[in-house]
Amino acid sequence: AAYGRIDVLINGAGGNQAAATVAPDKTIFDLDVDAVKQVVELNLFGTILPTMVFVKAMVEQKSGSIINIASEAALRPLTRVAGYGVAKAAVINWTKYMCGELALKFGEGLRVNAVAPGFLLTNQNRDLLTNPDGSLTPRAETIIAHTPFKRFGEPEELLGTLQWLASDASKFVTGTLTVVDGGFDAFSI
């Protein structure tokens, strides 16, 4: 690489759009297929393309850790976010595919893992989860009711997992999905 080694690649492309969701007063037949394609393009190809570019340097140096950001929405169908959930599920599949592809063809120094954040309160989703007065929206209340930690995560709470996956402390870990969600995925009523 022109700028030195590339030891870690974090593929964090992500996003959704209203037209790729199914609003409460709509049905799946109202889903805008072009909007879903755009969401898949952003989330899936926003992971595939950087990998294809940066993995070449990792192959040459025989080491590197690729971490793909998936989502809780990939693990269980969440209401309204059909396109986003499908795209992030594909990111998990891509992660598992690349784990074998790289390790078998280029050696054990190349690792690929994914992280599935749960509901983290960020600027991107704040308007969906909080009212202007700071109280929780009905959707947010439902999420919190199904999260054993009874709160949203903070973006900084992903850092420990990312640091571990990027480091040699996880050098025998590849093809895995680490869920960071306060117990949301594991909890049922």
Where are the model-predicted features located?
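A glycine/serine/threonine-rich, flexible loop-to-helix segment
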Residues: 23-26, 105-106, 119-146, 187-189
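Short, small/polar-rich loop/turn modules that mediate ligand/substrate recognition or access, typified
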Residues: 106, 111, 173-175
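Short C-terminal tail/terminal secondary-structure segment
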Residues: 76, 162-163, 174-189
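Amphipathic alpha-helical dimer-interface segment in Rossmann-like NAD(P)H-dependent oxidoreductases
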Residues: 38-60, 99-100, 104, 167
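Catalytic Tyr-X3-Lys loop
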Residues: 7, 29-48, 63, 67, ...
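Residue(s) in the substrate-gating loop at a strand-loop-helix junction
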Residues: 71
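Conserved mid-core segment of classical short-chain dehydrogenase/reductases
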Residues: 16-37, 60, 80-83
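Active-site helix of classical SDR
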Residues: 51, 87, 95
